[in-house]
Amino acid sequence: MPADVRPMLDRMVHGTVQAVSALATDVPERRRLDGRTVLRWFGLLCLMGAAFFGGYVAWLLWGTGLQTQRAQDALRPAIEGQIADPRPPSEGPKPGSQVVPGSAYAVIEIPRIGLDMVVVQGTDYTSLKAGPGHYVDTADPWDGTGRVGIAGHRTTYLHPFFNLDQVLPGDTIELLTGFGAYTYTVTKNFVLPEVTAGVVLRQTSQPTLVLTTCNPRYASSQRLIVEADLTQPTA
């Protein structure tokens, strides 16, 4: 073999060995890099998911409240004008009369929990965004008989009934309407499964008030119920 060829062959062999060696060691390294990349992306996705979920919860708890507050501000002047100059209860809408969902119905005041909000007509999804809602198939306070039903959100849309569990027997609830003011005294505070809670809205001859909301907080498997008897109607 010519002398000048051997060094060239040696260099070729040495280079090939180095290349094979580098390839052999590079595969696990690439796998390690790929594994770390997957973990980084997974961590990033988890952070993004947590941020999205946190933002959604914040919107439910506080963002929806802004929407309800705007509705309350728009509704209050009209109903307060009616309250300031009430008409006789006999002139109030009769059972079965047409109502406008989402329209101002009354102002509810519960001193125990510091509640003072406009009640709207209706308990559909849209109406309850504006505030507590009157079950339109139940009685009106000015009827002088029957059960008045009002529902309210527990944790969203300004959460009017967030602390309804703290309303106890003996506490008072005031309904201020364009046909007089009505004071109710609480007699019961209890919980029922959601599927059976409708029984509390059955009509009676006794003039009563029933408040309903979801229970426990942040869930809806049950209904928290407050019942109260009419103790002081004021025309």
What do these predicted regions represent?
Residues 1-39:
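Terminal targeting segments of Actinobacterial cell-envelope proteins
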Residues 34-235:
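Solvent-exposed, non-transmembrane regions of membrane-associated and secreted proteins
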